[in-house]
């Protein structure tokens, strides 16, 4: 029996590059075993709504073949089914003076935000700075260890996991046939982007019994 679109499962996983470097891990116990534990990380099972792009294509394809309780190690995912190949047009050059105007200290290897994009400074010299906006894992084949822990059946729990994935901040409550998202809380003065609201609303109304979503901001 395979996983179908709209089913929500919880998984634990370890993601590695092909040379063995861990780039993501969901289990606190496993992180300690691997020597990569950090207190800053929120370790917990990862929700995956099948068919909605919660994980990379190659991993979702494998999850579709698995059942609750299944686990598999060293799932080999080629770059084209992970974060794609590296694209030369995502490496751009800027005058260093533009960063100095913003009082940004430019150092090779640092992550930097330019407009709405985040990239890595790969070189500087002659008054110019080159920034690579490719995903850090683009062009790399990846290896995953994954275990399917649970299939979420209850609609309220399902909605809570979708909320955590799509929005993450605020409170969620339930009325008959309706979900209320309260984002008007201390420390979160930014609005939820309209595209995020749209995705959340579509996933809720398509994959749970709830017919309406109300946002309070």
Language model features: what each stretch is:
Residues 1-217:
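FKBP-type peptidyl-prolyl cis-trans isomerases
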């Amino acid at each position: 029996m395979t996983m179908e679109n709209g089913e929500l499962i919880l998984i634990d996983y370890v993601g590695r590059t092909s040379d063995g470097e861990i780039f993501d891990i969901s289990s606190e116990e496993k992180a300690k075993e691997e020597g990569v534990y950090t207190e800053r990380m929120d370790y917990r099972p990862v929700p995956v709504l099948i068919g909605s792009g919660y994980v990379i294509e190659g991993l979702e394809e494998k999850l579709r073949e698995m059942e609750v309780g299944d686990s598999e190690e060293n799932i080999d995912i080629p770059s084209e089914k992970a974060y794609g190949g590296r694209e030369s047009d995502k490496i751009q050059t800027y005058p260093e003076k533009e960063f100095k105007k913003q009082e940004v200290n430019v150092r090779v290897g640092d992550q930097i935000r330019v407009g709405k994009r985040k990239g890595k400074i790969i070189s500087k010299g002659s008054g110019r700075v080159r920034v690579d906006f490719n995903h850090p894992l683009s062009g790399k084949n990846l290896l995953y260890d994954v275990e399917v822990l649970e299939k979420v059946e209850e609609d309220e729990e399902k909605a809570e996991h979708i909320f955590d994935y799509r929005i993450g901040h605020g409170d969620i409550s339930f009325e008959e046939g309706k979900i209320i998202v309260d984002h008007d809380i201390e420390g979160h003065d930014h609005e939820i982007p309209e595209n995020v609201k749209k995705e959340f609303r579509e996933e809720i109304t398509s994959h749970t019994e709830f017919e309406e979503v109300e946002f309070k901001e």
